[in-house]
């Protein structure tokens, strides 16, 4: 990790430790059907792991960088629901933050208690730029949550998901015909929830041609 224990770095983290935390809510703990807001962390300064989770959520990139220099292992810290700093950067579409975390070897396939990866989180909020970045760093485009929801299934629940759907469907490893626990394809969900379903159906057709499922 190197010797990063300079006075300036310690000072930055100490400022963060005593920072006034806004009384907001952190988005976390989603199940496969709906978003949930979990109770805010009322004391993020109590540990360096909680500090980095809070700082990422507030997009305080300089403070996050200093925390990582002091303790690089915090890059994969988890909250009570299993969300990592990278999950939080992904669902907020903090692309520069996500890039910093990935450069410090954040796990792009880390899973929450419900089996969500950072890519699921990016797709839930139609954050195409973060989704693209995660795929570049080895995120599993077909990762299944506990409900067998892939990132493509999650994308399909968003009415205006054209950009993110395109990013996923252009990935060479995408399997658009995977079914979730309800035995639904992503295209079926997309047809029910929004105007982007032609993209999903075109993706399935291209996949079928590529894999020889149709003549």
From Swiss-Prot:
Listed GO CC annotations: cytosol; plasma membrane
Biological process per Gene Ontology, one example term: regulation of establishment of planar polarity
Disruption phenotype: Lethal. RNAi-mediated knockdown in the wing disrupts cell polarity and decreases levels of dsh phosphorylation.
Keywords for this protein: ANK repeat, Cell membrane, Cytoplasm, Developmental protein, Membrane, Repeat
Phenotype upon changing residue 87 to Y: Lethal. Pupal wings containing clones display reduced levels of dsh, reduced asymmetric localization of stan, delayed trichome initiation, and formation of trichomes in the cell center rather than at the distal cell edge
ANK repeat copies, ranges: 81-110, 114-143
Topology of this chain in the membrane: Peripheral membrane protein
Localization of this protein: Cytoplasm, Cytosol; Cell membrane
Mutation effect (residue 156 to T): Lethal. Pupal wings containing clones display reduced levels of dsh, reduced asymmetric localization of stan, delayed trichome initiation, and formation of trichomes in the cell center rather than at the distal cell edge
InterPro entries: Ankyrin_rpt (IPR002110), Ankyrin_rpt-contain_sf (IPR036770)
Subunit structure: Interacts with Bdbt; interaction promotes the stability of both complex members.
Functional note: Required for regulating the establishment of planar cell polarity in the wing. Forms a complex with Bdbt which likely functions in the regulation of planar polarity by promoting the activity of Dco during planar polarity establishment. Within the complex, probably functions to stabilize Bdbt, while Bdbt directly promotes Dco activity in regulating phosphorylation of core proteins such as dsh, and asymmetric localization.
UniProt-recorded name of the protein: Ankyrin repeat domain-containing protein 49
Gene from which the chain derives: Ankrd49
């Amino acid at each position: 990790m190197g010797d990063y224990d300079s006075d300036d770095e310690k000072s930055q983290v100490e400022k963060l430790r005593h920072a006034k935390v806004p009384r907001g809510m952190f988005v976390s703990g989603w199940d496969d059907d709906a978003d949930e807001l979990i109770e805010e962390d009322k004391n993020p300064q109590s540990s360096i792991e909680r500090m980095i989770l809070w700082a990422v959520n507030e997009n305080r990139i300089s403070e996050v960088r200093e925390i990582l220099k002091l303790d690089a292992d915090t890059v994969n810290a988890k909250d009570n629901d299993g969300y990592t700093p990278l999950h939080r950067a992904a669902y907020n579409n903090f692309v520069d933050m996500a890039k910093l975390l990935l450069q410090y070897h954040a796990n792009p396939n880390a899973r929450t208690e419900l089996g969500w990866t950072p890519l699921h989180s990016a797709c839930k909020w139609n954050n195409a730029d973060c989704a693209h970045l995660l795929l570049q760093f080895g995120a599993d485009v077909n990762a299944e949550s506990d409900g067998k929801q892939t990132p493509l299934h999650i994308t399909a629940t968003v009415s205006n998901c054209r950009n993110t759907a395109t990013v996923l469907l252009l990935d060479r490893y995408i399997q658009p015909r995977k079914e979730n626990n309800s035995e639904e394809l992503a295209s079926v969900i997309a047809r029910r929830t929004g105007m982007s379903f032609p993209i999903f159906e075109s993706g399935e057709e291209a996949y079928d041609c590529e894999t020889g499922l149709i003549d």
